[in-house]
Structure formats: structure tokens, C-alpha cells
Regions:
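Extended alpha-helical targeting/anchoring segments
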Residues: 1-214
Length: 214
């Protein structure tokens, strides 16, 4: 049996993540150390920070050599570029034409056990874009679906035998002024009275190696 608050506090100390959260209800709890920002909207400015491309830390390699290997990895680069293109396209549907820009491209973020490729994409919302338009355009996040999004979703619905539940969904808030922030629910535990559920996945492209992904 898990004490949600205690577990979340210990998890936050050992694996701090920018989009971590805890939901505690009498029937269930969600404990998450998600690192990924899907939507951050302030006024007419909107951004997304897709994460795609991962390297597990290796005690045999120092940090500099590990990063050199990471940056030369064609598969991880292709995966990240694909997701960046898709998220840029999603933003373009709701933003002023020409305003969507990649502000930071393929920077490396370091976590306790991993390195990730992260990009920052920003745009200026068009005047007609409403909250529902933003949600429809950006959700579900591209990094947990793949490209092209709609056909991939249809394929996943046929192939996946069980519903993902909260996994790869989003958690966040919408303010009264329309500002919002949402993450992508990964690295999370869905905890019930007597059971706990953890979902995992990997991004697969043509250059993927099954053993490496596992």
C-alpha cells in the first residue's frame, strides 16, 4: 500500500521533474514525475517543449563522451526532428501565420538516469483561437503518439489491447483569464486502494533497435 504524499515527496527528492504532480482522492491517487510541458499559454503567447530522444546514463562513459555519442545517434535525432515538425504544425493551426518559431532546438536536458533531447517552440495565438481550439490542436501530445497524428491514433486504437487510461494524457490548469499550462502524463503511477498501475512505452522509428528501446 502506497502513501501518496510520502511517495511523491520521496520521488521529488530523488528524481525532480519540472511537470511533477500529485492528485489525491479518496478512491485513487496519481503520482507523477513528468518532465514534459505540452502547453504553456500566457496572454497571446503559447509554447510547447517536446521531448523525444533519450540516452540512458552509462557508468562506463563520462558525461562528455556520452553526449558525443548521443548527438551522433541518427535514430534519436530523427525521432526528435519528427516530433518537433509535428508540434510546430499543431501550433501553426492556431497561431498567427509566420509567428511559430523554434526558439531552442534539440538541447540536452539531464535527469537522474537519463539525457533527453528537448526543443522549445513558441508562437502568437491568432485572435480567433479559443481554449477549446488550443486543446483540440495540441492534444494528445505528439511525442506520445507519433506522426502523422490522426492515422497513428487510428492505428493505435486497433493495435493496443487495453485503454491507456490517464497514461499519455495531460494534467494541468486553465485560469479565468485563459492562461493555461498542461503537461504530458508519463512516468506516473495510478494508485487505487489495493493496486497500483504503471504504464511505459517507447518511441519507435525505422532506425529503432528493439533491445535498446526495451
Amino acid at each position: 500500500k502506497i502513501d501518496p504524499l510520502d511517495f511523491f515527496c520521496r520521488l521529488s527528492k530523488s528524481n525532480l521533474a519540472p511537470e511533477a504532480f500529485l492528485i489525491k482522492d479518496k478512491n485513487y491517487s496519481v503520482i507523477s514525475c513528468s518532465p514534459e510541458t505540452l502547453i504553456e499559454k500566457k496572454g497571446r503567447s503559447i509554447l510547447t517543449k517536446p521531448i523525444a530522444g533519450t540516452l540512458k546514463k552509462n557508468n562506463k562513459l563520462n558525461k562528455n563522451k556520452a553526449l558525443q555519442y548521443f548527438r551522433k545517434n541518427i535514430k534519436e535525432t530523427k525521432e526528435h526532428n519528427m516530433i518537433v515538425d509535428m508540434e510546430r504544425s499543431d501550433l501553426s493551426r492556431i497561431c498567427v501565420p509566420g509567428s511559430v518559431k523554434i526558439k531552442k532546438e534539440k538541447t540536452v536536458e539531464e535527469y537522474k538516469d537519463l539525457f533527453h533531447y528537448v526543443s522549445l517552440i513558441k508562437g502568437k495565438l491568432n485572435e480567433k483561437a479559443k481554449t477549446i481550439d488550443i486543446v483540440k490542436s495540441m492534444m494528445p501530445g505528439g511525442s506520445v503518439i507519433g506522426c502523422p497524428k490522426i492515422s497513428t491514433l487510428n492505428l493505435l486504437n486497433k493495435q493496443e489491447k487495453e485503454n491507456r487510461n490517464i497514461y499519455t494524457g495531460s494534467f494541468g490548469y486553465i485560469k479565468f483569464n485563459g492562461d493555461m499550462r498542461f503537461n504530458i502524463i508519463i512516468r506516473s503511477i495510478l494508485n487505487f486502494k489495493n493496486t497500483s498501475e504503471i504504464s511505459v512505452a517507447s518511441g519507435v522509428v525505422i532506425d529503432s533497435n528493439a533491445n535498446h528501446e526495451f
